[in-house]
């Protein structure tokens, strides 16, 4: 005799908490690389985001009269906090991070009904909110440690985040200076600014910050997230289609752009290993709630993100484009899933 159970018949043995913890664990190589090259700021921001996210989650659940402990223990709010902390500049003022994190949990997540019902990726909603509201602070990244004019320890990072000045009294504007006395920016930001000033790609990329595939420090940060992403694929936490489609389409678009206008476009390898490329491809775009769920839909979704990232980086007003690309793709998910839904056996074609 066979026991016939009710649908659904396909099950994922990994519980939500386990999946979230695996994703957080996979972030560690990238976090370690960020800490090594850019100081302790990201670590402090993650801790602050965790406190804010869990507090906001508990507050909303209490107001909605929902069980608090199970929701706090499922790891979803913690993962959102980690992704926000990793995405923001390490020395962003504390109140901006608190504002963005609270907005992600209260508005982007619970306004739509909570876990499993949000249309947009909460971490990217927070990022875009802060980028549009505070563009100067959101583009204030430190130079990598090898070309930084001032050493910044844990105490200095905490002091800048909470007071705006290091323990020695240096402001953020001073800390952004490189050893040559010039104010530094991320490789993507430096490239965008240089091209807008009429310089060629070769002239811009002669700057010291462009050492390596994606710039000093950024190549290693992206390699760290690539390593974490491969771990998630090996553990079957994420599907290969979304990151594969993103990286493949970004590589193809960047290659075509470079072949057509080499003096106005960065190399394909630069696009793959700079900015938030690997973090976005493996950890952000693969959010199971806001991403496409059909096999073909995941490929379309990933290609859309990859192409949008290149187009916004090349022609848009923001140096890195992953947050905007992911949110625009999230908006298209219902249509993508509708058009790529597998056919039901025996159903009539309309």
From Swiss-Prot:
Modified residues (FMN phosphoryl threonine): 186
Enzyme class: translocase
Its EC number(s): 7.-.-.-
Primary location group: membrane
Keywords per UniProt: Cell inner membrane, Cell membrane, Electron transport, Flavoprotein, FMN, Membrane, Phosphoprotein, Translocase, Transmembrane, Transmembrane helix, Transport
GO BP annotations listed: electron transport chain; transmembrane transport
Membrane topology of the entry: Multi-pass membrane protein
Ranges that cross the membrane: 15-35, 36-56, 67-87, 88-108, 122-142, 213-233, 242-262, 264-284, 299-316
GO-annotated cellular components: plasma membrane
Obligatory cofactor(s): FMN
Alphabetized HAMAP family for the sequence: RsxD_RnfD
Function: Part of a membrane-bound complex that couples electron transfer with translocation of ions across the membrane.
Similarity remark: Belongs to the NqrB/RnfD family.
Subunit: The complex is composed of six subunits: RnfA, RnfB, RnfC, RnfD, RnfE and RnfG.
Protein name from the UniProt record: Ion-translocating oxidoreductase complex subunit D
Organism: Aeromonas salmonicida (strain A449)
């Amino acid at each position: 005799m066979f026991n016939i159970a009710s649908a659904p018949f396909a099950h994922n043995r990994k519980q939500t908490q386990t999946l979230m913890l695996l994703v957080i664990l996979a972030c560690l190589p990238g976090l370690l690389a960020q800490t090594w090259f850019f100081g302790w700021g990201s670590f402090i921001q993650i801790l602050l985001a965790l406190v804010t996210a869990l507090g906001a989650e508990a507050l909303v659940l209490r107001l909605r009269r929902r069980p608090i402990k199970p929701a706090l223990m499922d790891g979803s709010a913690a993962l959102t906090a980690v992704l926000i902390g990793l995405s923001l500049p390490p020395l962003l003022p504390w109140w901006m991070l608190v504002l963005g994190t609270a907005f992600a949990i209260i508005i982007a997540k619970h306004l739509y009904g909570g876990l499993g019902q949000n249309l947009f990726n909460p971490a990217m909603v927070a990022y875009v909110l802060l980028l549009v509201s505070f563009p100067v602070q959101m583009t204030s990244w430190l130079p990598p440690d090898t070309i930084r004019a001032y050493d910044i320890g844990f105490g200095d990072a905490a002091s800048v985040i909470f007071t705006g000045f290091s323990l020695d009294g240096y402001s953020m504007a001073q800390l952004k200076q490189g050893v040559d006395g010039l104010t530094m920016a991320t490789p993507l930001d430096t490239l965008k600014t240089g091209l807008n000033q009429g310089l060629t790609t070769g002239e811009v990329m002669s700057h010291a910050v462009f050492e390596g595939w994606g710039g000093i420090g950024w190549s290693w940060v992206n390699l760290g997230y690539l390593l974490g992403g491969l771990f998630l694929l090996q553990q079957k936490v994420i599907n290969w289609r979304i990151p594969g489609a993103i990286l493949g389409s970004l590589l193809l678009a960047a290659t075509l752009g470079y072949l057509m206008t080499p003096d106005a476009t960065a190399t394909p390898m630069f696009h793959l290993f700079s900015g938030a490329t690997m973090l976005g491809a493996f950890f952000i775009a693969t959010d199971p709630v806001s991403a496409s769920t059909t096999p073909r839909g995941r490929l379309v979704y990933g290609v859309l993100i990859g192409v949008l990232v290149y187009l916004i980086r090349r022609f848009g007003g923001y140096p890195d484009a992953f947050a905007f690309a992911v949110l625009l793709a999230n908006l298209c998910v219902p249509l993508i899933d509708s058009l790529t839904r597998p056919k039901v056996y025996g159903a009539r074609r309309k």
